[in-house]
Amino acid sequence: MKNRLSILLFFAMTVVATGFVSCSEDDLGPSIFDTKDYPLDKSLYSFPLDTFLKVNFLEPYNVKYIYRMEDIGSDMTKNLTPASYEKSVQLAVLSKYLWYDIYEMYGTPLFLKQNSPRIIHVIGSKNLNPSQGTEVLGVAEGGLKITLYNANDLNPSNIDHMNEYFFKTMHHEFGHILDQTHLRPTAFNLISSGKYDASTWTNLPDSMAAGRGFVSPYAGSAAGEDWVEVLANYVTRDTLSWAALMRAAAFEWEEVDMTRSDYTKRASGANLDTVGYYRQHDNGEEKVYRKVCARNANDYVALDEEGHVQWLNKTGVHGDEIILQKLEMVRNWLKDNWNINIDDIRREVQRRQYMTNPDGSFMFDNRGRLINKLTQPSDEDPSITTMEYLVKWVTNYKSLQ
């Protein structure tokens, strides 16, 4: 396995033979599924989850949530495995809690019914591309289906990992579906025109991407991916993570050839901020990525008369300003087309993921980190955690067996 596994969010545009027709408020069109009501088998161990999915996804939104992996609907070139029942339950309730319920809260009554994917297919294992050093986190197909991978690694105790693998992926792929319904402004495609590279983004560090005006390396692969990455990252990144991204984006970054031993000699104390950080790529190349500043003939930092680092911007590109410009376009697009305020969505996502004080401000632990709400006593029943309370949405259906 390679030393570093790049993350790939792959968007598959599947051409549907009958074409794609957007729905109007007056006519949502017929269901794409067999609409006959088949009674669920109460003798099955999975009856509670099957009932939950029927009541919360199929009936209100015409969404078929598939957790029993279907080979014919999977990547047949990969060795994939199904999601466990336990992880399927967790992902299902979190999908409702952190995705559907929030858009239901701030969208129009028909927003999800019109724009939701018709199929959500959950796979238990990772989808790896070893030859490319990439990993497929999710796939959106033809505006109808979203496939999510790696469900068996879902860990509600680790929100960063959970967002990266699942909820950023959900918002990313959902953004593609919305972009097919109301195309993004053509002006967006021009902001970073000439800077997209579909072949080299996998080796682009986060800081370099940010300095160029991209919220993630993958955003630098194509304008369409840039658009949905802005949406997904803004919604799922917490306030500390977003602030760190914007700080990195405020600088110009450069790539320097440097061995690990040379880097170790230089990266000490206050020099660390100007030396940057070391990284060894899949092909064995050793690189250092550092902020651009004035340097002397020996490549050491040249301080000004007051002893301060002289940060430089040789390209004239201000990554933080570019990211905010892109975000404003996404904000206006959601507001103009669906009357949805992305800041309301983001605020509610974070409120459901992290502990807050009575005044709505976030709570921090003694190390200055946000506190995971899912692992804390729930508001509804303090004797159990929020995650345990959400799981009861499913287990409560056992009473019907």
Give short role names for the model-derived ranges:
Residues V63-A83, G307-W311:
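Acidic/histidine-rich, surface-exposed loop or edge segments in extracytoplasmic proteins
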Residues T77-Y85, T134, D153-H161, Y165, ...:
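Second-shell loop/turn segments in exported
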Residues K96, Y100, E104, G175-L183, ...:
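Sec-exported extracytoplasmic/periplasmic mature domains
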Residues D160-P185, V228:
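Active-site recognition of the HExxH zinc-binding catalytic motif
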Residues Y196-I340, I345, R352-Q401:
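Metalloprotease/metallohydrolase-associated module, dominated by Zn2+-dependent proteases
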Residues M1-L5, M13-V63, M387, T395, ...:
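Bacterial Sec-dependent N-terminal signal peptides
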Residues L28, V89-K145:
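Auxiliary, metal-adjacent structural segments of Zn-dependent hydrolase domains
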Residues I119-V122, K145-Y149, D179, D226-Y234:
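Structural recognition of the beta-strand scaffold that forms the well-ordered cores
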